Swiss-Prot record:
The keyword Ribosomal protein applies. GO terms for cellular component: cytoplasm; small ribosomal subunit. This is Small ribosomal subunit protein bS16. SUPFAM superfamilies: Ribosomal protein S16 (SSF54565). The gene is rpsP. It comes from Acidobacterium capsulatum (strain ATCC 51196 / DSM 11244 / BCRC 80197 / JCM 7670 / NBRC 15755 / NCIMB 13165 / 161).
Length: 82
């Protein structure tokens, strides 16, 4: 099963995260299929960048989002089309 979840990056005590598409049984920072965004909790407010089209593609293919990623996607709605 494929998951969309966070992969920790950054130095000790200075984390930032990549939002990755990865096989569920892989290690947290294992080889990912695709990077679909970033999340930096250290900025104020926390910065989130999402590739919505790719997230929609992978969820359409059956990928499950982790609880935290689902919350980040929900808190950061897509911009309205012009």
């Amino acid at each position: 099963m494929v998951m969309i979840r966070l992969a920790r990056m950054g130095a000790r005590k200075q984390p930032y995260y990549r939002i990755v598409v990865i096989e569920k049984r892989s290690a947290r920072n294992g080889r990912s299929l695709e990077v679909v965004g970033t999340y930096n909790p250290r900025t104020n407010p926390a910065s989130v960048e999402l590739k919505r089209d790719r997230i929609d593609y992978w969820t359409g293919k059956g990928a499950q989002m982790s609880d935290r990623v689902a919350k980040l996607v929900q808190q950061n709605p897509a911009p309205a089309a012009a």
